[in-house]
Amino acid sequence: MVLVAVGAFAQDFASAYENLKSIVYNDVVAKESEVLAAYNDAAKFVSNDVEGAQIDYLAGLFYMNNNDKAKAGSYYNSSLAKSKKSYETNPTAEAYCIYAEALSQNCTVQSSSYMVSNGTKVPNFAKKALALDPKCAGASYSLACYSIYAPAPFCNLKKGLKILDETINTSKLDTDDLFNYYSTYAYVALKQKNTSLADEWLAKAAEIYPNNKNLKMLQKHEFKTYGEDIDTSAANVE
């Protein structure tokens, strides 16, 4: 009976987590009240710090994409605290992975000094996740993003693409992983002025989360320039 109850509880979290994820990623139509309701629903079934960190990360993502850096940073900080607590007591790929993801995104909503101090730590935590699970798609994505979206002197499209290619061909990706990979392929194609290739990747991404703000921007062949307040003149874009 206990095992059945635990299994059902885990399934309830998985379902609630997927629902929160879908609402957050379809942020063109998502309302804050819907996100918070889905967040609170998922929180009822959280059974460990990694799960808590995961839903905090999604809430941070929603507020970041709605230009509320203060709330985004608050949720990202909470995600970092929970995932750190988890990997310090029970090192797992999932704990290191969500820590790397939250740290990476937190760098975009905090000060430039925070980015400089913490941005270079992202690959270390992603690599720790991959050491425990070589097929951890989220950790590989964090590594790829470090090369693709980072300001100079860390930007290297060629290196980032190699990581994406290796992962998408060898790992099992969840829906959000696939969306992120497709969107990033499109971003790189636009950076390389290959709009036809970008559109192919965007069509794939649109099949997953059609109402995503970043997707809509990329579909207009527009994209954010990351690290604008940091010198990017020496970016290694290959």
List PLM regions with ranges.
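Terminal, low-structured helical/coil segments at or just beyond the last alpha-helical repeat
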Residues: D176-Y187, K191-E238
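Structural marker of alpha-solenoid helical repeat scaffolds
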Residues: F45, E88-T89, L132, T170-D174, ...
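Helix-turn-helix repeat elements of alpha-solenoid scaffolds
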Residues: V24-N40, K69-K82, M115-P123, F154-D165
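Sec/Tat signal peptide C-region and signal peptidase I cleavage site
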Residues: V6-A10
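Extended amphipathic alpha-helical interaction segments
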Residues: M115-D176, N180
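Surface-exposed, polar helix/loop patches in the mature regions of secreted/periplasmic/lumenal proteins
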Residues: S78-A131, E200, A206, K216, ...
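Bacterial N-terminal signal peptides
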Residues: M1-A5
